[in-house]
Amino acid sequence: MGVITRDGLDWLKDKLIKAGHVDTFKLEGVKEDRKPVIGGGLSILYALFDLLGIEEMHTAQGALRQGVLQDLLGRLENHDNTDLRGTMVTALASRFAVDLAQADRVKRTALWLFQNLQANLNKKASRLIQLENKLSWAAQLLEIGTRISHSDFHKHGAYILDNADLTGFSMPELHRLSQLILGHRGKLKKLEPELRDHEFVCQLISLRLAAILCHARREPDLQGFSFQQSTQSTEFAIQCTKSWSQLWPQSVHLLQEECDAWLKSNWQLSFQISSGV
């Protein structure tokens, strides 16, 4: 990879001055149709070096796509209409024939659960919106791996996202989504590094519980069901009424298994059935 320095800029400026005109300027590797823009590009680089105090610049493997600054500004101001990521997620879900009704159920349930944890996260509203968006996208793409195989589909889905090229997403963002999908079921040991991040844990536990509550692929019954994080930030608590547990015995069984899964991590999940109706 090449490196641009001030000495290099001075050398190029001298070559341009000696040439007198772009038509007579010669430089190995420069195509004829690029010559007219060299002077302007050199001026911009000089200004950047001076204004930003840059000592050297390294060339990158890619380039900024058209409109990326407007896209990033829209994200900061939470303007959904300028953020391409949601559009890309929808397109990817369609490409892998995701059950959109189920994805929507899981998404809405995960967001409802996550909103119960936001007080303990103690984050600004703009940051909470960002976390909700990423949780929504993970829920929408939860089942993309089923197109490959229903066995270990969460692993296939994580692999797809880790290797996808989705406009608007950075590689770290895609990896975070892949880890949410990978961890939405099964053992938590595979996510030990990520479980040090409180934000990630709140997203993950919301997604795992949403998948459980929507396991029958129908609208979950959230009446008589509550979820919160205790004042001790490593403990989460589920509570349901006795009548809820009687109506949904399979969900109760799955939730109890979920509590056992979290026992093997640094985070704890409890499940209590109240004596009330």
Pin down the residues of each PLM region.
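Helical "lid/coupling" subdomains associated with nucleotide-phosphate turnover
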Residues: 1-217, 223-238, 242-246
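Charged substrate- and nucleic-acid-binding regions of tRNA-handling and nucleotidyl-transfer enzymes
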Residues: 225-276
